[in-house]
């Protein structure tokens, strides 16, 4: 009996030691909320923390990540999309509780839905054809996300039966859905399309992480578009620091929401461990620096591997780049709604480059990023014509909130210095000793 009590206390101690400690500070910095995370080191812990922050549509203005090999210390400077500090206590509690529970590594469960994964060759009208097939097969699209990049498309769609509202479990019906969608993705006998479909009713991982994985598996990073060759959206460099046994990765690009998630997600899925990192934003620009190793502790070992890391990180940033006009559709949900809307896009020469579909309480809230056939921003008159056909009150042109930055962050720099001094830990001294932080800005 005494042994059982001892084991219970030991188990509690292990859980307490491995559970991340979160401190949220709204007083030290006037322009951002500081989120500090202390945790024992394990694979994926950084990605999970960043994922929680980005899923709340928070902007990470600055971040400092450091590890002594067994312990992590991460500090994030976050705001909402309008550049305001976080004052909603329910949001602050959610952040704290969510990060503290990632130790248990639970998968995302989608109750009562069937998950559909698709990859193939992108073309104008593809989304319209996909939704037309699903409508014809009495599939109700509840949630979905679709990305396009370098001529490829990846999508994760959650379905239920239109009539019963239940998940689709019948193997014959699932096979029919997969077959018809694969025909759509293949197009006119395109032997190079390499279309893939997969239907599952199991719990799924984070949908945006899965989209990155689908694009990576499809090797979209090898098909750099002429548009990106002319005007690179992101500059990535990789160098080895032989003395310390690190590979140093620098990413410079335009700042946007979820940027840090996209980069850390890709590094994690490529099985690199981030030991130290600094993230800084100024105006609309972002600079990210990572000190990484393989899981076995070795740095990048060849020129081919170095080039692959560069290509994959460029692709990770470009996949979510804001291209085209953002249209938001809010409409009572009904069977065939998505097929009707996307058919109107196709008939008017609009190409959908990215999509986010969600349904709540019988109301559909959908986001479409559209371009013309050449990948350029569509003419305003064309957009208004499409809105009139779908419904001016239902379909609106929506601008993303401007990323909030101050030109002179002198006050914040002083406050950041105070944060670093107050931490006073060996881990933070390592950041300076290793030369990972040249200044506190």
Swiss-Prot record:
Keywords: Repeat. Residues 34-110, 115-196, 248-324, 326-405 form the ACT domain. One of its GO terms (molecular function) is amino acid binding. Expressed in roots, leaves, flowers and siliques. The keyword DNA-binding does not apply. One of its GO terms (biological process) is response to abscisic acid. PROSITE patterns: ACT. Induction: By abscisic acid (ABA), and cold and salt stresses. The keyword Secreted does not apply. May bind amino acids. This is ACT domain-containing protein ACR8.
């Amino acid at each position: 009996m005494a042994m059982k009590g001892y084991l219970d206390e030991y188990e509690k101690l292990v859980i307490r030691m491995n559970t991340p400690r979160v401190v949220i500070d709204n007083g030290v910095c006037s322009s951002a909320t500081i989120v500090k995370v202390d945790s024992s080191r394990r694979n994926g812990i950084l990605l999970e923390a960043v994922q929680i922050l980005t899923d709340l549509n928070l902007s990470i203005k600055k971040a400092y990540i450091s590890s002594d090999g067994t312990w992590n210390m991460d500090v994030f400077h976050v705001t909402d999309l309008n550049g305001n500090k976080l004052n909603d206590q329910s949001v602050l509690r959610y952040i704290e509780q969510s990060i503290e529970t990632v130790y248990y590594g639970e998968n995302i469960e989608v109750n009562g839905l069937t998950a559909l994964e698709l990859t193939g060759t992108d073309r104008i009208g593809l989304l319209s054809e996909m939704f037309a097939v699903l409508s014809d097969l009495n599939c109700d699209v509840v949630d979905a996300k679709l990305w396009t990049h370098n001529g490829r498309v990846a999508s994760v769609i959650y379905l239920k039966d239109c009539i019963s509202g239940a998940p689709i479990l019948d193997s014959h019906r699932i096979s029919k859905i997969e077959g018809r969608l694969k025909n759509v993705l293949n197009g006119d006998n395109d032997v190079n399309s390499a279309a893939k479909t997969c239907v599952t009713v199991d719990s799924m991982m984070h949908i945006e992480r899965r989209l990155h994985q689908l694009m990576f598996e499809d090797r979209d990073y090898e098909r750099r578009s002429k548009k990106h060759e002319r005007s690179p959206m992101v500059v990535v460099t990789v160098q080895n620091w032989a003395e310390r046994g690190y590979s140093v990765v620098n990413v410079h690009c335009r700042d946007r929401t979820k940027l840090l998630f996209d980069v850390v997600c890709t590094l994690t899925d490529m099985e690199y461990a981030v030991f130290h990192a600094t993230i800084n934003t100024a105006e609309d620009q972002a600079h990210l620096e990572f000190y990484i190793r393989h899981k076995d502790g070795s740095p990048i070992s060849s020129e081919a591997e170095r080039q692959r890391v560069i290509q994959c990180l460029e692709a990770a940033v470009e996949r979510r780049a804001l291209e085209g006009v953002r249209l938001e559709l809010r409409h009572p949900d009904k069977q065939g709604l998505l097929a009707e809307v996307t058919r109107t896009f196709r008939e008017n020469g609009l190409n959908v480059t990215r999509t986010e579909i969600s349904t709540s309480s019988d109301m559909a809230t959908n986001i479409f990023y559209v371009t013309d056939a050449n990948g350029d921003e569509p003419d305003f008159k064309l957009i208004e014509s499409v809105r009139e056909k779908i419904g001016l009150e239902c379909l609106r042109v929506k601008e993303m909130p401007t990323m909030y930055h101050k030109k002179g962050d002198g006050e914040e720099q002083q406050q950041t210095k105070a944060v670093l001094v107050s931490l006073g830990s060996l881990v933070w001294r390592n950041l300076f000793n290793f030369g990972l932080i040249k200044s506190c800005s």
